[in-house]
Amino acid sequence: SNDGFKKISWEDAYGTLTDKIKSTNPDKIGCITGDLTNMETLFSVKELFNKILNCKNLDSRPVKTYVNNSSRTNYIFNTQISNIEKSDFILLVGTNPRHEATILNSRIRKSYLKNNMEIYSLNDVGDLTYPYKVISSNTDELKKIILNEHEVSKKIISAKNPIVIFGQSALKLNSSGYLFEGMKKFLSENNKINDDWNALNVLSNNASTVGAYDLDILDNETIDNVLSNQFELVFLFGQDNLNIKKKNEFIVYIGTHGDRGAEMADLILPSAAYTEQDGYYTNLEGNLQLAFKASYPPGEAKEDWEIVNEVSKKLKGKSLYTNKQELIDNLLNYLNQKTKKNGETVKNDFIKEEIFVDKIDYYFTNVIARSSKTMAECRNLKLVSLKTGTDG
């Protein structure tokens, strides 16, 4: 209602939600998962949608970016962070690693100091703590590199262990498919992608990105339809970075903080934060890792998978899983059986455009950081130092 939210019981919340699901055509239901969502949640949501709702409208991206998930090598950091020190040449494409991946950036700095390696960037991204050469940020320049018509092409070919890093800003471009696939082809043809060394890397910004792609939570039509208000019922699982103007759709927010997703929701189901539940995540390099909880969820908040399980029970009379271990077993089984498949065939046209690197609000990068007093203080100090010119 316009005057805020009304407190209801879990039973009423499930009742409201299941009534809404039953009265909505599955084609008109969509879901976007969040940037801190663990893999148990991602998998249970996928199973709920695919098996119970008979619906495939799932995505994990708040904006459309180019992803070819026919092979993991298209969306992970293939070179591995520990191998950066073996590199003798780096090309940054639409990324500011100092803000997007600080540990990775410190490795690049260490490698520069140790090997005096050359670093190039398509765009001036400010102080990275090491010198780098700036190439024009137009996609034309990258096209020339890919076609072996640029000095950087020669440097990549002559380098023993080159590294090319695509940031998320580059993958948002209209011609990102052309540029990414073109670079992959160029590196392959010059034997820079082989059993010992893979020079092609993608730098994902969020903890849940790689795991979501591994679980195929990716659908260009879904994100288009959410952003253009085509769905009647939208689930946001910890998703607070969507830039949409709400119209008539019914929005269900399952999350932890009263942030952007909750503000436009019609129904809020409180869940545990990532610090309040054990959960699997797949990191930048594609390794599965288990994060242990540091505390318990407040009040009546539940773990996300429990909410999904309960919704399934209310709809079909039976739960998806008898316990969390069964869910984890099913999840690991899915990952083990996953084979290479054909990615969505996207027409990869070249378009001349500027490669901008998105400015990251460093201390406010996610919903939990945005609600932290400490992070707010750090951010304010940074803003003050920028205004006074005392920022290094």
Region locations from a protein language model:
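Short coil/turn motifs at helix boundaries and re-entrant loops, enriched in small/polar
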Residues: 116, 203-206, 283, 301, ...
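Internal, active-site/partner-interface "lid" segment
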Residues: 305-306, 317-338
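Glycine/threonine-rich phosphate-binding loop and adjacent beta-strand/alpha-helix elements that clamp
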Residues: 276-297, 312
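Short, charged, low-complexity patches
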Residues: 300-304, 308
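Catalytic alpha/large subunits of respiratory electron-transfer oxidoreductases
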Residues: 1-277, 311-319, 339-392
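Residue-level signal for alpha-helical context at structural boundaries
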Residues: 67, 126, 286, 326-330
